[in-house]
């Protein structure tokens, strides 16, 4: 996991087995940005949701294939508006970090500051329209 802010992290694919550890570490919500069947062996959204709920985590599925749409960014913004410690994940964390950045910028955040925060976490958003 890579910190995008004090309460938001981006991550590559999370395993259902890892979610109880995240809950124990203080995470309260998981946002799954992977479409089902993106690659062989990937857990389905239903499997991740069941594990998240069993661990006491709030779960949101906002599948993103490619560049996040404004509607997907808005859904991510809604998932983050209550400042619950949240891990967003996709295959590499890139789509999740892009959706996070688009969500913040749509709500008035400075694009350069958001890009800098993503870069500090290891995500290059220089080509993402914010």
PLM region descriptions:
Residues 1-87, 98-130:
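Cys-dependent protein tyrosine phosphatase-like superfamily
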Residues 90:
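Short cysteine clusters
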